[in-house]
Swiss-Prot record:
It is found in: Cytoplasm. This is Ribosomal RNA large subunit methyltransferase E. It is an enzyme of class 2 (transferase). The gene is rlmE. Specifically methylates the uridine in position 2552 of 23S rRNA at the 2'-O position of the ribose in the fully assembled 50S ribosomal subunit. Keywords: Cytoplasm, Methyltransferase, rRNA processing, S-adenosyl-L-methionine, Transferase. The active site is at 164 (proton acceptor). Belongs to the class I-like SAM-binding methyltransferase superfamily. RNA methyltransferase RlmE family. It comes from Histophilus somni (strain 129Pt) (Haemophilus somnus).
Amino acid sequence: MGKKKRSASSSRWLNEHFKDPFVQKAHKQKLRSRAYFKLDEIQQSDRLFKHGMTVVDLGAAPGGWSQYAIRQIGDLGRVIACDILEMDPIVGVDFLQGDFRDENVLQALLERVGEKKVDVVMSDMAPNFSGMPAVDIPRAMYLVELALDMCKQVLATNGCFVVKVFQGEGFDDYLKEIRSLFNTVKVRKPEASRGRSREVYIVAMGYMG
């Protein structure tokens, strides 16, 4: 019985996915994912990226955000990306495959960043969801806490942080912490984000270091 439910749910999700206008648009424009349009909408509102910037992309695969960022920052810019999943190469993107929660992977990522601070840290990380919010939300919050820890280590003064967060237990405290570290903080729900999803994007600008 449970198997049939999962199958029906999966079929419904796939049907919605392929009918999604942003999925169709991404496919037509040969983009890595619909997430490209989420970041584009944020950029139109908040102007995070400029030519020559250095950007860290956490949870990068399949590469929609890295693809967008490198187009914004140009040949003189640099994207350092990390994901537990494989990602096809993108010109200008330095990709590290590994689990960001692993200390060795984190150290390898920090080595790639180097001593110079970065301009933007962005995270589209999400756990594998079980369908049980009591399990999924803490897992998701753990990942966004790690992303914020990364900011504290590598983000330059006045730098920006963009992070996908799932609303639920811990969200308000997390938002409060970000507001204590950045001059300007917005909570965005891009049009390309599915309406019934708990996800929102915290856009934080003016890191106080």
